[in-house]
Regions:
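Nucleotide-activated chemistry modules centered on ATP-dependent adenylation/adenylyltransferase
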Residues: 2-32, 36, 139-142, 156-157, ...
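Short linker/helix segments within small regulatory modules
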Residues: 19-25, 409-412, 602-617
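A broadly conserved sequence feature marking short terminus-proximal activation segments
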Residues: 1-8, 360, 364-388, 546-596
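RNA-binding accessory domains that recognize and position tRNA/RNA substrates
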Residues: 2-253, 265-274, 281-284, 493-496, ...
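ATP/NTP-dependent adenylation/nucleotidyl-transfer catalytic domains that generate, transfer
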Residues: 2-91, 96-99, 103-107, 403-575
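Iron-sulfur cluster-binding cysteine motifs and their immediate structural context
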Residues: 32, 591-607, 619-635
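Short cysteine-rich clusters marking metal-coordination/redox-active sites
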Residues: 14-17, 27-30, 586, 593-596, ...
């Protein structure tokens, strides 16, 4: 996967104090020079909590033998995690100013620890599993040319190695040479004299490393005091400026997460007493709701709550499971209640400070620091922490002694809806372990899979999180064409065709969109053909998806529409509905054929379009017996 650059990588390291330093070329404790850390972008490193560290140690021990985990992550050392782009999830593990390895979640195999050179050096004297020793000639080839390890050069190996294992390669004196992935089993390595046994990922060379001094997070805060003071002062100036320029009541949108907590504390530091706004989506963790109430009490702030109630569960019957590419839930559970809250309590407008950060996503990186949501025009939003990294946020919270949501210390990176489709599988597995709320969702998704004839993989890998499976996921799971087709298995339904939709600004992906659903599966060949009325149509290889002019239609009924403004969104929705009704309920009357100036419409029982003749003028749209609705019937 390509690098995701969302801003400058601010992480540096003081080797003398063995502490992470943000931005500064000198350490805030010893005054010594710091060095730039080379992280995978976006470089939004965060603290590893006790539960994270214990899971890392356990994983390393299970792969390489007892005691290796403690060697990788020594007691009393600062540990950071840096999320890197991957098919599902990968976190680089930073200890003593070096990346010792990465925890990667593989869809089929689960969590694996991928050693890096410094991690290999740390465990080499202790390794009892997943090791091979090679002869001097092989070691020279690996070190000098980064060559893979061939079977002919292997002297000995752990008898439990199977293809796909992460392996530490040692020389005859058991010094680390390289790390990589096994391509053979142990018996094949010993029995074969040709072929690649270990595909090299990294050769082991000396890397800069901290002194190994023990430290705690109070030391890190102290070492970064100057940069924290500078960041806080800038944010306070920004807050004062926005407040002075807008004669509006001030609020903080609070979610129970670290970023909104930091934003609240900055507003309080600026001497402003805001109202606290919380939208209860109906999908919140109990820990989050408790945190919201506790924070309001601790700071004696007026808490205004708007709840979506059971909106999510009611709308499931119409829209089916939400997905990364079909986020109807953002409209019904976030945007709707937020709009109601503002209209009810701030009819003349409100200035709302929001914990948005550029390092969270490309969309947020491109967003202004002050903005208006087109669907909540009474809300002026502003972010004091737009250019902060996660580590800036955490160090600020630590400096304030803030009580954060306990879910972070239980291993979650993000706090939101407990079954958010944007969640990666690794984190979703953790949610299932700790969340009582997830049981209801699991029951629904199992019943839905049974009713719709979904294959077992749809449940096992939570593939409900997509309407259109990414090629990387299809390839990783080894899903063939037939399996992909059955992910959206068509069901027969003789009931009348209906269309329901929810539209608005999508707070999850920052875009103007509508998610809708037709009440039964669609004949995609006819729908794709008729969509040619408005433009050139592209279809997926399996024929399950058709796209034209930012309109996406799925065989099993869902649709997604994107537009630059509300007027365009409504126009596209009305046009799509008319076209789909024509495709599904065509009576074969031929009325529309006479409207086409190019003779592109043909009647052979049902109307079809000759795409070679159609110039997408849309003149054929008009009175039609199949379209039994008016423009204002659209449920938007």
């Amino acid at each position: 996967m390509g690098a995701v650059v969302l801003g400058k990588i601010h992480l540096r390291w003081c080797d003398e104090c063995d502490l992470p330093i943000l931005e500064q070329a000198t350490c805030g404790i010893c005054g010594g020079k710091t060095r730039q850390m080379k992280l995978t972008p976006p470089g939004d490193a965060r603290p590893a909590f006790k539960s994270n560290i214990e899971r890392i140690k356990s994983l390393v021990d299970s792969q390489f033998g007892e005691g290796c985990g403690a060697a990788i992550v020594p007691e009393g050392h600062i540990v950071l995690l840096n999320k890197a782009p991957d098919i599902d999830r990968m976190d680089e593990v930073i200890v003593d100013g070096t990346i010792v390895g990465a925890v990667r979640y593989e869809l089929l195999a689960g969590e694996k620890f991928l050693l890096r050179p410094s991690g290999a050096t740390a465990i080499a004297p202790l390794v009892r599993k997943s090791w091979v020793t090679i002869d001097p000639g092989a070691a020279k080839a690996v070190l000098e040319r980064s060559a893979s390890t061939l079977a002919v050069g292997i002297l000995d190996c752990d008898g439990g190695i199977v293809p796909g294992d992460e392996v530490l390669v040692l020389d005859e004196n058991r010094n680390p040479v390289s790390v990589g992935t096994s391509k053979m089993s142990a018996s094949e390595m010993k029995g074969h004299k040709r072929g690649t046994a270990i595909k090299t990922r990294w050769t082991v060379i000396a890397e800069p490393r901290g002194s190994g001094k023990e430290a705690d997070w109070k030391d890190v805060v102290k070492a970064n005091n100057e940069v924290l003071t500078r960041r806080v002062d800038e944010s306070k100036r920004f807050i004062h400026k926005v407040v002075s320029e807008n004669d509006l009541p001030v609020a903080v949108s609070y979610s129970g997460g670290k970023d909104s907590l930091a934003t609240l504390l900055l507003v309080l530091d600026a001497g402003i007493r805001p109202k606290l706004l919380f939208v209860d989506t109906g999908l919140e963790f109990e820990e989050t709701k408790r945190n919201v109430a506790e924070v309001a009490r601790e700071h004696t702030l007026e808490l205004i709550v708007e709840s979506a109630g059971d909106s999510f569960w009611r709308n499931l019957q119409h829209f089916g499971p939400p997905a990364k590419d079909f986020r109807w839930c953002c409209k019904t559970c976030k945007l709707g209640p937020a709009t109601q809250l503002i209209q009810k309590h701030f009819p003349k407008g409100v200035l709302s400070f929001i914990g948005q950060r550029a390092y969270e996503s490309q969309q947020r990186a491109e967003k202004s620091r002050v903005w208006r949501n087109p669907w909540t025009p009474n809300q002026l939003a502003a972010s004091p922490i737009q250019k902060w990294t996660a580590l800036h946020v955490w160090l600020y919270l630590m400096s304030k002694g803030a009580r954060t949501n306990p879910l972070y210390e239980q291993g979650l990176e993000r706090i939101g809806c407990f079954m958010c489709p944007a969640t990666d599988l690794a984190e979703l597995r953790r949610v299932k372990e700790i969340s009582r709320e997830y049981d209801r969702w699991q029951r629904f998704i199992e019943e839905h899979a049974s009713e719709k004839g979904k294959p077992r993989a749809w449940l096992d890998y939570d593939l409900w999180r997509w309407k259109r499976l990414p090629k990387s996921v299809v390839d990783e799971l080894g899903l063939g064409h037939e399996a992909c087709l059955s992910m959206s298995a068509e069901q027969t339904d003789d009931a009348p065709l209906r269309f329901e939709s929810t539209s608005g600004y999508n707070p999850c992906v920052e875009g103007l969109s509508m998610e809708g659903v037709f009440s039964k599966p669609l004949p995609m060949e006819r729908v794709a053909n008729m969509l040619g009325i408005i433009g050139s149509v592209t279809t997926s290889p399996d024929g399950n998806i058709a796209e034209v002019k930012s309109i996406t239609v799925f065989r099993d009924g869902p649709v997604m529409i994107r537009a630059k403004d509300e007027e365009e969104l409504r126009r596209k929705a009305a046009m799509l509905r008319e076209i789909v009704f024509r495709a599904v309920e065509c009576a074969g009357c031929g009325i529309c054929t006479g409207r086409c100036p190019n003779g592109a419409l043909h009647l052979d029982g049902l109307v079809t379009i000759d795409t070679a003749k159609c110039d997408h003028c849309g003149r054929c749209l008009g009175p039609c017996p199949a379209v039994r609705f008016k423009q204002d019937d659209l449920d938007i």
